[in-house]
Curated annotation (Swiss-Prot):
Required for rescue of stalled ribosomes mediated by trans-translation. Binds to transfer-messenger RNA (tmRNA), required for stable association of tmRNA with ribosomes. tmRNA and SmpB together mimic tRNA shape, replacing the anticodon stem-loop with SmpB. tmRNA is encoded by the ssrA gene; the 2 termini fold to resemble tRNA(Ala) and it encodes a 'tag peptide', a short internal open reading frame. During trans-translation Ala-aminoacylated tmRNA acts like a tRNA, entering the A-site of stalled ribosomes, displacing the stalled mRNA. This is SsrA-binding protein. It comes from Helicobacter hepaticus (strain ATCC 51449 / 3B1). SUPFAM superfamilies: Small protein B (SmpB). Pfam families: SmpB. GO terms for cellular component: cytosol. GO terms for molecular function: RNA binding.
Length: 155
């Protein structure tokens, strides 16, 4: 349960149908934690791979913060290990290999204990007509909200 969401992967909600989501920890360096606290993280185009029984986050961009230690500059797009139980990793790996599904991060947030957590999801790619359908649905909801708002003002 997120307390404060730092970054959302909006592209994942549009491109994929979310089947199952779960919470995982993430292994970070000190400067990366400071950058995340400052909100300098981007999850767009990031994905999760399971390698040798361990889950890794690839292509997540955590910007370097200039106020941190300057002699060591970490790679901003390095792979980061995810902290999951073995059963969860096995379940995800089975789903990915059998059903040709993917694992993507949805958002990064602070939990109640002020720890940085990553919400990951097992997803299936949407077809083009599904994407168009979701765009139409969003537009209709937006128009209905605007119409209700203007109707409320007239009363």
């Amino acid at each position: 349960m997120p307390i404060r969401v730092i970054a959302k992967n909006k592209k994942a909600y549009f491109d994929y149908e979310i089947l199952q989501s779960l919470e995982s920890g993430i292994v970070l360096q000190g400067s990366e934690v400071k950058s995340i606290r400052a909100g300098r993280v981007n999850l767009k185009d990031s994905f999760i791979k399971i390698i040798r029984g361990e889950a890794f986050l690839f292509n997540a961009h955590i910007s370097f913060l200039q106020t941190t230690y300057t002699h060591f500059k970490p790679n901003e797009r390095r792979e980061r290990k995810l902290l999951l139980h073995k059963k969860e990793i096995d379940k995800l790996f089975g789903s990915v290999s059998k059903e040709s599904l993917s694992i993507v991060p949805l958002n990064i947030y602070f939990n109640q204990k002020n720890k940085i957590k990553l919400c990951i999801a097992l997803v299936r790619g949407k077809k083009l007509h599904d994407k168009r359908e979701s765009i139409k649905k969003k537009m209709l909801e937006r128009e209905a909200r605007a119409h209700m708002k203007s109707y409320g003002k007239k009363l």
